[in-house]
Amino acid sequence: MSYTNTFIKVADDCPVNKSEIPLSKKDKKPLHLIQYELLKENPYKFDHEGLIYEVFVKTKEIPGKILEKDAEKIKTALFSKGHPCLRASALTKRYGFGAHYDDKGKIAIYPMESKEYEAFMAGKTVKIIPAMKTKK
């Protein structure tokens, strides 16, 4: 699912009062850490599908030569099934980041304590939806 002009606010049951940068104790980075790095370094570069694809490529460590040759085949296989949006990401549920989708569906993340986050929450220019709660 992809959104436009939408802000995903931090989950109501988020355990932090201030955003935290995700860390990993393992060699292989978890999905939310890769999402964080991509969105922090490239705000409004990726839409939902682009983000999923980049995270997949980084997670599977697919070499550039294979991507050059088989990118379409990889995308077709990847998107043959559904993928959760950032409402279900640990970034919005656990680490205290809101996600903004602009009018083209491109995504940027904002710490919950930032002025930008407050502006999205106070303004009427975007639809505000909550991240999914961790507990039911």
Question: Where do the PLM segments sit?
Answer:
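Non-catalytic accessory regions used for complex assembly or targeting
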Residues: 1-72, 76-85, 104-106, 110-125, ...
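Short, surface-exposed charged micro-motifs
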Residues: 96-100
